[in-house]
Amino acid sequence: ARAVGIDLGTTNXVXAV
């Protein structure tokens, strides 16, 4: 998610990879 930059909200909160 972080690499794609689509799940910004999820990556920030859940910190999903």
Swiss-Prot record:
Signal peptide: none annotated. Keywords: ATP-binding, Chaperone, Nucleotide-binding, Stress response. Induction: By stress conditions e.g. heat shock. It comes from the Bacteria. GO terms for molecular function: ATP binding. Acts as a chaperone. Belongs to the heat shock protein 70 family. This is Chaperone protein DnaK. The gene is dnaK.
